């Protein structure tokens, strides 16, 4: 049965009551004593540190200026619920945070609020127990797998810093309905899932504005970055390995189908299926505009160095592009590197694309003979 931590006993209130009372009798129930020992509340700082006692109710979490989660074991089927925090709250992860196994959709962690800071202390890890879920099917069948970290409705000047995610069952960060959010120094290590992990997107962005992701180090089995909608999105200084590259889309078929003012720069994509990718949905409506890829280095790419296409249907290309999601004002500047001999250097399939700036030097693979609808100055 799926539980939400906010429905459990409020140990914070219980801890405050006990601190004002005489010392507990030696015969006190061990579970209660352990729980009380796990909660320390001083001057608005709330610490949860007993591995056997996951983050409790926190019905009183709104009174915590700082929440420290130290070596906590979150029960199976449970969301570590850090939503609705008071403005300016600082959340710190210490030690290893673990999550029990259960087939469910998640998320494992959810955070929301205004001017929220989430920090991973030195040596801390959030371990998603992915090996128990990976079956080669991802979200397309098999076991039901929980998504990892919802960064939804984070507003103001919120940030997530130096957090290390290990072994995510599927998608890692879902960034949705957020504004002014910065993620820096994030490490995502799903390398243990290289044979059976699937749909382990690192950063999925939707319906968000003014988002910056800097210094990410990602090893996964799907998109390193996937921007499905949003404006003012920056990804810089990232290293992506093992996945599907730096992607816009697929765009179309959702409630929000506009991507604009995106900068993806100073990043490396290696040992991945694709390097740079923009894809829109067949027959859908929306727009992609003002997207810049700058100073992108590719190596060990196995499918496409650069792929931009307007023909996606049910997650797969059809070879027949449609014009309902025009791709305009795209700049590829100093996108360079190598692909494998069986891969394709560049593939562009457009029905409505215009106003592109093209500075691409990708070598080592095949030259596509199926490119179509190329904007002026673009070469396959």
Curated annotation (Swiss-Prot):
Q: Can you tell me which residues are glycosylated? A: 361
- Whether Disulfide bond counts among this entry's keywords is yes
Stored InterPro entries: Glyco_hydro_28, Glycosyl_hydrlase_28, PbH1, Pectin_lyas_fold, Pectin_lyase_fold/virulence
Q: Where does the protein principally reside?
A: secreted
Matching entries from Pfam families are given as: Glyco_hydro_28
Disulfide bonding pattern of the chain = 46-64, 224-240, 350-353, 371-380
What this protein is called in its record is Endo-polygalacturonase
Q: Which organism is it from?
A: Sclerotinia sclerotiorum (White mold)
Q: Which gene encodes it?
A: PG1
């Amino acid at each position: 049965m799926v539980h939400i931590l906010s429905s459990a006993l409020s140990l914070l209130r219980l801890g405050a009551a006990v601190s004002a009372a005489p010392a507990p009798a030696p015969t006190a129930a061990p579970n209660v004593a352990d729980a009380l020992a796990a909660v320390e509340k001083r001057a608005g700082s709330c610490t949860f540190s007993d591995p056997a006692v996951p983050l409790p109710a926190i019905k009183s979490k709104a009174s915590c200026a700082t929440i420290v989660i130290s070596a906590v074991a979150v029960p199976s089927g449970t969301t570590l619920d850090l939503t609705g925090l008071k403005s300016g709250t600082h959340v710190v992860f210490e030690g290893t945070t673990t999550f029990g196994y259960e087939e469910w959709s998640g998320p494992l962690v959810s955070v929301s609020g205004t001017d929220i800071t989430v920090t991973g202390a030195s040596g801390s890890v959030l371990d998603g127990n992915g090996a128990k879920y990976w079956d080669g099917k991802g979200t397309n069948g098999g076991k039901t797998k929980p998504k990892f970290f919802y960064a939804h409705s984070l507003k103001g000047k919120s940030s997530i810093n130096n957090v290390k995610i290990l072994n995510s069952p599927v998608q890692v960060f879902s960034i949705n309905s957020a504004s002014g959010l910065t993620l820096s120094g994030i490490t995502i290590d799903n390398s243990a899932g290289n044979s059976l992990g699937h749909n382990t997107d690192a950063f999925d962005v939707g319906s968000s504005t003014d988002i910056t992701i800097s210094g990410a180090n990602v090893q996964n089995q799907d998109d390193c970055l996937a921007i499905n909608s949003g404006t003012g999105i920056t990804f810089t200084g990232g290293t992506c390995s093992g996945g599907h590259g730096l992607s816009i889309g697929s765009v179309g078929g959702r409630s929000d189908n506009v991507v604009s003012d995106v900068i993806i720069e100073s990043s490396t994509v290696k040992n991945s299926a694709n390097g740079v990718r923009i894809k829109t949905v067949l027959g859908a409506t929306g727009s992609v505009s003002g997207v810049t890829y700058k100073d992108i280095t590719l190596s060990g790419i196995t499918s496409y160095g650069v792929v931009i296409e307007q023909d996606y249907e049910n997650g797969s290309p059809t070879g027949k592009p449609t014009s309902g999601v025009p791709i305009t004002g795209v700049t590829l500047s100093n996108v360079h590197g190598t692909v494998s001999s069986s891969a394709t250097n560049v593939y562009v399939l457009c029905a409505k694309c215009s106003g592109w700036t093209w500075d691409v030097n990708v070598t080592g693979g095949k030259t596509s003979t199926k490119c179509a609808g190329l904007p002026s100055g673009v070469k396959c």
